[in-house]
Amino acid sequence: MSIDPSRIDIEFDPLRQRMVGVSAHGLLPFDVPFISEITDNLWLGGCEEGLVLPEVIAHLVSLYPWERYTVNHELDSLLEVRMYDSTDQAFEQVDAIASWVNTCRQAAPTLVHCQAGLNRSSLVAARALVLGGMTPDDAITLIRAMRSPACLSNPSFERWLRAL
């Protein structure tokens, strides 16, 4: 196949591109960038196949292996874990992932992503914040303020965090 001689180079910036939809839990509308900075070196977001990962991200934690970022730079670490946004998702692995996130973000910007950056990744990011000394209420409030009120709309995820 030949290349279109009139083709232009287009860059897609996940900090500017937006995801718009309605959450599966609570039917809450959301309009968010693909990734959002929550606090120092902690980024939260969604993914779309082929979206280019910003070079600022050094550590990538993917909770949604069904779609992948295109990574054009060397990552310091990559962790891929299959999680579901369901009310019967088990929580056994959350502490280990959240601890890993805290280790990574001590060194460099770390992105935790799932499909939309609302529930699975918010669960892990909130738990990382709690393990770092924040109260569950403060962690949930921060994530919702910095990302979307639709974050942690999965009732079992929010209930688990608040019960800690």
Language-model regions, residue ranges each:
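Cysteine-based protein phosphatase catalytic domain of the PTP/DSP
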Residues: 23-109, 127-160
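A phosphate-binding catalytic loop at a beta-strand-loop-alpha-helix junction
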Residues: 108-126
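A short, flexible N-terminal coil/short beta segment enriched in small residues
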Residues: 1-25, 50-56
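Charged phosphate-binding loop/patch that engages nucleotide di/tri-phosphates or the phosphate backbone
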Residues: 4-15, 150-164
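Short, intrinsically disordered low-complexity segments
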Residues: 6, 15-17, 119, 126, ...
